[in-house]
C-alpha cells in the first residue's frame, strides 16, 4: 500500500502524482533516493528534493540504531538452501537474505548451475529456513525469482530437469521466475531497477540473480581510459542490488567472471572482475573451481562474520548434490 506523499514537506497533489509516476510510491523509496534522482523528475528542484528526502527519512525513522535493534533486525534474515549440505554449512545455514552473494570462477565451474538450482529451491518450502517468531510465513509465501541473464545461459529445460528430480513441479518454478535477457550494461541496470516495479505489482520477489555481473561492463568499457567510468557505473549497479536485498529482504546472487592474476605465486591464480567496487559491495564472496569429474570446490574467501572455508559439491543431471 502506498503512503500519502502529500505528508512530505513541499509536496502537493501535483508533485505527489509526478513522484508516483516516477515510481516513488512510498516514503522509504524517497528516503533512500538521492537528490540527483529526484531532480530528474520535472519540476522538482534540488532544494525541494532535499526537503522531501529529509522528511521521508524522519517518517521512516532512519538514523542511528542500537546494537540490540540491529540484532533484532538480523533475526529477520532467512536462508535458502543450495542443495549441498557442505555449501550450506560454509554459509552458516544457506544463502542469506539481505545480502549479495558472489560466485566467481572460470567457465564451466558451475556458477550458472548454482543459480538455476537456487530458482528451483525457492519453490520448495523445506529449503527455506527462518525464525518463525521473527519472519511470518506470509513474508516467504509464494516467493518469486528474477533472473537477469547477460550471457544467454538461462535454460528453462534445465530448470524442469532439476525440478523433476527435486519432486517439484517444473511449470510452477518457471511460472514464478521472471527472466530478462540483458545485451548491454544499460539494459542490465534498468532491469535491476525495474524489480521494484514487479514488487509493487504484488509479486513477492525473494530471489534476484544476475548471471553474470560484469560481462556487459567488461565488453563495453575496454582499456584503462574507460576503467573509471566502468567502475562508477558498476558501483551504482551494486548499490541497487544491495538496496533490493535490504529493503525487500531478498537473496541476491551474482556470478562473476575472472581474469588471470600474473603476480600470484601462492593462493588463487585468478581474481574476480570488478576490483574493489565489487569486493566491498558483495557480502559473501566465493571462488568456484573444477575438481575431478563432476566435483566442484567453492571457497568462501570474504564474509563479514564467517571464516574462510571450502565446500565440495557435485553437479549432476539431478542438479547440485553432495
UniProtKB/Swiss-Prot annotation:
Q: Which UniProt keywords apply?
A: ATP-binding, DNA damage, DNA recombination, DNA-binding, Nucleotide-binding
Record GO biological process: DNA recombination; DNA repair
Pfam families of this UniProt entry? Answer: HHH_5, Rad51
Q: Which residues form the signal peptide?
A: none
Recorded GO MF terms: ATP binding; ATP hydrolysis activity; ATP-dependent DNA damage sensor activity; damaged DNA binding; identical protein binding
Q: List positions binding ATP.
A: 105-112
Tell me the InterPro entries matching this sequence. AAA+_ATPase (IPR003593), DNA_recomb/repair_Rad51_C (IPR013632), DNA_recomb/repair_RadA (IPR011938), DNA_recomb/repair_RecA-like (IPR016467), DNA_repair_Rad51/TF_NusA_a-hlx (IPR010995), Hlx-hairpin-Hlx_DNA-bd_motif (IPR003583), P-loop_NTPase (IPR027417), RecA_ATP-bd (IPR020588)
**SUPFAM superfamilies xref list:** P-loop containing nucleoside triphosphate hydrolases, Rad51 N-terminal domain-like
Record SMART domains? AAA (SM00382), HhH1 (SM00278)
Query: What NCBIfam families has UniProt attached to this entry?
Result: PRK04301.1, recomb_radA
The role this protein plays is: Involved in DNA repair and in homologous recombination. Binds and assemble on single-stranded DNA to form a nucleoprotein filament. Hydrolyzes ATP in a ssDNA-dependent manner and promotes DNA strand exchange between homologous DNA molecules.
Protein family per UniProt = Belongs to the eukaryotic RecA-like protein family.
HAMAP family of this UniProt entry?
RadA_arch (MF_00348)
Tell me what this protein is called. DNA repair and recombination protein RadA
